[in-house]
Design a protein with these regions (language model features):
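N-terminal, motif-rich segments that launch catalysis or mediate targeting to/interaction with membranes
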Residues: 1-92, 110-132
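Short active-site segment of divalent metal-dependent hydrolases/proteases
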Residues: 44, 99, 103
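Short alpha-helix carrying the canonical HExxH Zn2+-binding catalytic motif
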Residues: 91-99
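Alpha-helical transmembrane segments and their lipid-water interface positions
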Residues: 104-108
Length: 132
């Protein structure tokens, strides 16, 4: 996955290209939620019990298993929000999260073509260097 800063820069550039003024304004008013969404599930890679192998890492699960269902549920959850501000905050977060997924989807084939898919200390370091 691209690094935190890479995801943020991608999100800023994507935001600048949004033509729809309603969407543009919602994201502007909810910049923090959008920025958090841009990080996707990557924050969970730093959850210590999962990093040490005591539990399955939720970041891996969200990235690799039933991704379509995850997005479907994420989007459906917005319909239960009754306050307009809550809806806009959730909308901005989801827009950011989708941006995260788009960048990961575009970058991974390139990264894998450069370093392969096997995991070792060397390839993992190269993998992170390319993504960042």
């Amino acid at each position: 996955m691209p690094g935190f800063v890479t995801h943020y820069i991608f999100g800023v550039n994507a935001y600048k290209q949004i033509d729809n003024s309603d969407i543009h304004n919602i994201i502007y008013r909810n910049r923090q939620a959008y920025s958090l969404g841009l990080q996707g599930p990557d924050l969970f890679y730093y959850f210590m019990p999962a990093s040490l192998g005591f539990k399955p890492n939720i970041a891996n699960i969200i990235h690799k298993k039933k991704t379509n269902e995850f997005f479907r549920q994420l989007i459906a959850s917005v319909s239960s929000l009754t306050r307009h501000q809550d809806y806009e905050t959730a909308f901005a977060y989801i827009e950011g999260f989708m941006g995260h997924y788009l960048l990961d989807t575009a970058m991974h084939p390139y990264v894998y073509s450069r370093v392969g898919t096997s995991i070792s200390n060397r390839t993992l370091g190269e993998h992170f260097a390319i993504e960042t």
